[in-house]
Swiss-Prot record:
UniProt protein name: Bis(5'-nucleosyl)-tetraphosphatase, symmetrical
Superkingdom of this protein's organism: Bacteria
Gene name of the encoded protein: apaH
Protein species of origin: Herminiimonas arsenicoxydans
Function of the molecule: Hydrolyzes diadenosine 5',5'''-P1,P4-tetraphosphate to yield ADP.
Gene3D superfamilies registered for this protein in UniProt: 3.60.21.10
CDD domains per UniProt: MPP_ApaH
Classification via Pfam families: Metallophos
GO MF assignments: bis(5'-nucleosyl)-tetraphosphatase (symmetrical) activity
Record keywords, A-Z: Hydrolase
Keyword Hydrolase on entry: yes
């Protein structure tokens, strides 16, 4: 079965439809994997979320930071940012059905031998460990304690993974790695201040995927999140955030043969240091 991995949508529903038309013209009913940030900043977050909900028999998603932010805003833990475009979801008659489905999605998944995440994987983690740690977060997010989990989710510390981490600190570190990571120090300490392109790392930092002895180096990691990185294709990496909401492109890559399909996107937001 053919599978396409698709980059950050961020509420760009029109471009999603155009991309799916191109995919279906080549491989009708191909399996789909979306690497998170389904909603927010684009003009049609509700339509995008509803469309993926309708595709759930052929599509899988991992949660991104904007998707988690939607859940936090919806339950009153966070105020919307001035650039957020979530009002249509918050006012929708089917919001609870959509949000319940959303919080039952994983932060990491395996598809055809690929590890799919939104942002990155810490160098200390193997593919199986990343999936297991994602499962810890998923268990809480899908439980009756999900609001309390979201309340403790925000923050940049602990910035370095330790197997002995417990409670909210442990879950926060997992979430930050899988949904926010770009740069790390050589010892695996996460940096959340820098969002620039990977070829210009600050002193003492490297893109997470260039760290030596990364335990997922023998697997192919598929991710999004890093729009200034653009399309990245290496034997063991697929970076798919090509800046759709910023006036770039929406990208799909066939996981079997790496055929690439793209659609151009109008600029809905101006890039900032925290996109």
């Amino acid at each position: 079965m053919t599978t396409y991995a698709i980059g950050d949508l961020q509420g760009c529903h029109t471009q999603l439809l155009a991309l799916l038309d191109k995919i279906d013209a080549i491989t009708p009913q191909a399996q789909l994997v979306f690497v998170g940030d389904i909603v927010n900043r684009g003009p049609k977050s509700l339509a995008t979320l509803r469309h993926l909900y309708g595709l759930r028999q052929r599509a899988r998603i991992v949660l991104g930071n904007h998707d988690l932010n939607l859940l936090a805003v919806a339950c009153g833990l966070r105020k919307p940012h001035h650039a957020d475009t979530l009002d249509d979801i918050l006012a929708a008659h089917d919001r609870e059905e959509l949000l319940t489905w959303l919080r039952h999605q994983p932060l990491a998944l395996e598809q055809d031998g690929h590890l799919c995440v939104h942002a990155g994987v810490l160098p200390q983690w193997s593919m199986q460990q990343a999936l297991a740690l994602s499962g810890e977060v998923e268990a809480v997010l899908q439980s009756e304690n999900w609001v309390a989990f979201l309340h403790g989710m925000y923050g940049n510390e602990p910035a370095r993974w330790d197997d002995d981490l417990q409670g909210a600190d442990r879950l926060r570190c997992i979430v930050n790695a899988l949904t926010r990571l770009r740069f790390c120090s050589p010892d695996g300490r996460m940096d959340f201040k820098t969002t620039e392109a990977a070829e210009n790392p600050p002193a003492g930092l490297l893109p997470w995927f260039d760290l030596p002895d990364r335990k997922t180096a023998d697997s192919t990691v598929v991710f999004g999140h890093w729009s200034t990185l653009g399309l990245l294709m290496r034997p063991n990496l697929l970076g798919l955030d090509t800046g759709c909401v910023w006036g770039g492109k929406l990208t799909a890559v066939n996981l079997q043969d790496r055929t690439t399909i793209q659609v151009a996107c109008p600029q809905h937001q101006r890039p900032s240091k925290k996109n």
